[in-house]
Amino acid sequence: MRVGTSSNSLMWILRASWVALLLASPWHVAAHHSTPVNVVLIVGGWAMGASGLLSSIALTPIGLTVVRLVTVPMVALVTSQVSYGITENNATVAMTLALVAIACAAALACTTRVSTAMVQAGAYGDETRYPLRTPFPYVLPAALVQLGYTAAIISGPLLLAARSYAAGVAVTLIAVAASFKVPRRLHQLSRRWLVVVPAGLVVHDHLVLAETFMVRHANLTDVRTADGPGEEADLTGGVFGRRLVVSLTAADKVVLAPITRQVLGTTDALHVSSFSTAPRQLDAAMARLKK
């Protein structure tokens, strides 16, 4: 599937937002502390801004995770320096540009079209990927984890630069330890999609499933939408509202992830004759499956 014109336009706006942020360089405005703190702010600002821009150019699912990871600390950096940049440093234009740019980048990073464009860019051959909605039970924990990780990543080096060595070392060690797990865990949210291929469909969701679940076209009897959970196996992970319900000619085996088994109180594998999943572009996915 080719990325649509509207998605391409949004991607260009996202790239332009990162370019504008780099041009505004609000981390230079923020650098009004001691020299070590200034160095941390400037190096960190350029590194995060460049990462956001490069990830929006080289479209990949990993890039989607990177954009989401760097957007949060950039929002914190820009908003925390608005007052000083405008009143003390007389940098009204730069700070206004930075605010608008990071607001656009943050908003676009959350949109379905940007997510789809970045996920689809990594597709193989004649396959169409539809990102899945984030299960409700994971939304708040994921947000809290990202906020905590962001706070540790930012405050650790700044505390060290400000010579608060005890607190700085402790927070930096926490940030380093978290870096081995948090990005990988958050990346799972970017690697959840329904794939439509000529041979059938694939549910690629290692947050909910232990193994990728593939259904061949010959085993598909019906595809429909539903407003909520029904008698079918719920493979959405706990999404509210509309979902795609797929009915099979013969029951097929689906292997659940450990956390899904605990939530459902069932065995590690189920034989399902119908199941539901929740792609963000629900109607588009159904139309593609019915072709």
Where are these regions (language model features)?
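Polybasic phosphoinositide-binding surfaces of eukaryotic membrane-targeting domains
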Residues: 192-204
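Terminal and domain-flanking low-complexity segments
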Residues: 83, 247-291
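Phosphoinositide-dependent membrane-docking surfaces
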Residues: 201-203, 212-230
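Membrane-anchoring hydrophobic segments
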Residues: 1-91
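Anionic N-terminal interaction surfaces
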Residues: 121-195
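Short, surface-exposed polybasic-and-hydrophobic patches located at secondary-structure transitions
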Residues: 231-256
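N-terminal membrane-targeting/pre-transmembrane regions
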Residues: 1-11, 92-153
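Hydrophobic core segments of alpha-helical transmembrane domains in multi-pass membrane proteins
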Residues: 41-48, 94-103, 168-177
